[in-house]
From Swiss-Prot:
This is Sec-independent protein translocase protein TatA. Belongs to the TatA/E family. It is found in: Cell inner membrane. The chain crosses the membrane at residues 1-21. NCBIfam families: PRK02958.1, tatAE. One of its GO terms (molecular function) is protein transmembrane transporter activity. The gene is tatA. The lineage of its organism: Bacteria, Pseudomonadati, Pseudomonadota, Betaproteobacteria, Burkholderiales. Keywords: Cell inner membrane, Cell membrane, Membrane, Protein transport, Translocation, Transmembrane, Transmembrane helix, Transport.
Length: 75
């Protein structure tokens, strides 16, 4: 019941290859590799010395409405 031997893993690999097919497994492998590459590039960009662009927020006076809230009284 402990660890699996190499024969167990080979049988599992053969069953997976029969179920999914080698072309599908190749596509999954290339997609996974692309995802890892993109993650590494993203981490490299995050650690770079470039300062982040400042996002400026423009206030539009026409869209601002000044209101006062009043408490509702039961009469």
């Amino acid at each position: 019941m402990g660890s699996f031997s190499i024969w167990h893993w080979l049988i599992v690999l053969v069953i997976v290859a029969l179920v999914f097919g080698t072309k599908k497994l190749r596509n999954i492998g290339s997609d996974l590799g692309g995802a890892v590459k993109g993650f590494k590039e993203g981490m490299k960009d995050a650690n770079s010395d470039k300062p982040a662009e400042q996002v400026t927020q423009q206030k539009v006076a026409d869209d601002t409405i000044d209101v006062q809230a009043k408490e509702k009284t039961n009469s």
